[in-house]
Amino acid sequence: MFRRLIGVVVATVLLSFQLLVGSATAVELDKATRTVPLNAEGETTVLSLKQVKEGKRLFNYACAQCHAGGVTKTNQNVGLTPEDLALATPNRNNIEGLVDYLKNPTTYDGEEEISEIHPSIKSADIFTAMRNLTDEDLEAIAGHILIQPKIVGTKWGGGKIYY
């Protein structure tokens, strides 16, 4: 009888503690972390927490099959690191550049269109994950790509040595 009473008391205390504490929430990213380049002219924008969350979800849905961890499975020499994006032609190290790429992808040097082999809005009939993405969705994905180096550091795009 005493054991049963102790068990009930312990269970009651633990359940009461759960109600008082509530569920755990993710650490909110500060404004500096959420500030990313908007365009090649140097303007910046601050992503909302909703955009950050949605960007991660959409990236995992539409992009992570080939770009998990910021690498490119089909070409290990070019990833989604800030350096790789900045050296592309046109510069893709900003929201507008990445959104343009997601609409109409080109080779790293910008010379040839590759929409038939890279998912994009232009090739949504082939790559169905891109079908229903809006411009806001593309901006959220671009924002996710641009804040990852600030969150995970050199692991983003680091390749096999990290994963």
Swiss-Prot record:
Segment forming the signal sequence: 1-26
Compartment list: Cellular thylakoid membrane
Recorded topology in the membrane: Peripheral membrane protein
Gene Ontology cellular component terms for the protein in this record: photosystem II; plasma membrane-derived thylakoid membrane
Cofactor remark: Binds 1 heme c group covalently per subunit.
Domain of life per record: Bacteria
Binding site for heme c: C63, C66, H67, H118
Main location class: membrane
GO biological process, alphabetically ordered: photosynthesis, light reaction; respiratory electron transport chain
Cofactor requirements of the protein: heme c
Protein task: One of the extrinsic, lumenal subunits of photosystem II (PSII). PSII is a light-driven water plastoquinone oxidoreductase, using light energy to abstract electrons from H(2)O, generating a proton gradient subsequently used for ATP formation. The extrinsic proteins stabilize the structure of photosystem II oxygen-evolving complex (OEC), the ion environment of oxygen evolution and protect the OEC against heat-induced inactivation. Low-potential cytochrome c that plays a role in the OEC of PSII.
Family per record: Belongs to the cytochrome c family. PsbV subfamily.
Protein name: Photosystem II extrinsic protein V
Gene expressing this chain: psbV
